[in-house]
Amino acid sequence: MFSPGTTVEVSSKINNKEVVWVPAVVIKEFKEDDEYKYIVRVYDKSFSCKGNKAARLNKTVDLCSLRPTPPSISVEEYQLKEYVEVFHDGMGWRQGRVMKIQERVMLSQGRVMVSQGRVMGNLSQKCYIVLLEATKKQISFKQSDLRPLQVWEDGVWKMLQTRESSLTQGSGDETSDSVRNANESDPPVTPRPGITTPPLKQIEAETQRKTLPRNQNASVNDSTRENENSEDINRKRKREESLCSDASVEDTTMTLPFEKKLSIWKTLESVETVPQSPHFSPLVETREDCREMSAVGMMLTFPCLLEEVKSLQHDNSISSLISLSNNFCELEKHGFNVKAPQSRISKLLSLRGKQSMKMDELKGAEKVTAEKESIKIENERKILELQRLNEEVDKEIAQSKSCAAKIVQQLEDVELQFQTTASAPW
């Protein structure tokens, strides 16, 4: 957990793909939905208040977006092909790779001279051409803008192998050069799953096979031919033993609780619909003189049941399907292979169940439709009744208007008589 005032780095994305780490300070820690959240303020790499004020606004992040500030490592000179982090345009620490090392020399006239080799003097300054991993752009950086690439894993900062080897060996060591050349692939920030190295014993065995002398190869070939001959003899013995065992198994499986005396057996056993080899062992508990006839009846019943399954219709009752399944169960006790028909019946039962459910849903929908139609008819009846009442009211309104007109005429006549009477001469 990060307490307020702790310097950290918060992850941010550029163009929704490149992750950069920006220096920040924890302002507040709080818990929301059983998850720790942090209010942080972003700064530049030196934690200065200069620069864009909008970039220093407080932001709320979760714990996965934070990591502590990596420990500072003093580096005299970065090596070629070394993975580093660079602080670019104030956006944060971005992952890159050193592609070229240059030295800049400040002249008295204020001009800058760039040299590929080393330049002695206090006015020289190293700069590095770094390839940004995300954009594949090469940009020049001062050494102060670089730091070794470290990985935060399982709460511990881990240094990449390239930096460890460069710290323990000289820059001119051939071994370190070979290590750097071998590491010219993408940075191993996280281990890639599924990449394994062959066991040491396997490599040694392959090497020995490649370096065997010719005389040893000849002896190996002779021994190989002897082994092949012995293997042929063993295979022949195994075939003979398997034939004997198959014959014994056949004798065992064909032992029936009765003797096949009826000629119909040849016809029954030639049926190729579903070849069967029932044992009829439950018939031991029945009368001996009835066993063969019972077995023949089962042999005749089985293909009939198969045809009955094939002739089933969608409107057959579920009870008929269950009855068929029970018949096959009885035959299974006598050694019939009923897996295929039972599987089909099981599927038909499932479909029949869905059909029954849909029929119930259809009945419910039809019932609702009938109820709504009944309500509609009742509403239409009420509408007709209201229309009839409106027509009667219209007639009454017309009569009232006619009566009112007569009354108005009578009032005018009375007023005229009143005026006539009042103005009559004496």
From Swiss-Prot:
Residues 164-248 are annotated as: Disordered. Residues 256-425 form the DUF724 domain. It is found in: Nucleus. InterPro entries: Agenet-like_dom (IPR008395), Agenet_dom_plant (IPR014002), DUF724 (IPR007930). One of its GO terms (cellular component) is nucleus. Residues 164-184, 213-222 have a biased composition (Polar residues). It comes from the Eukaryota. May be involved in the polar growth of plant cells via transportation of RNAs. This is DUF724 domain-containing protein 9. It comes from Arabidopsis thaliana.
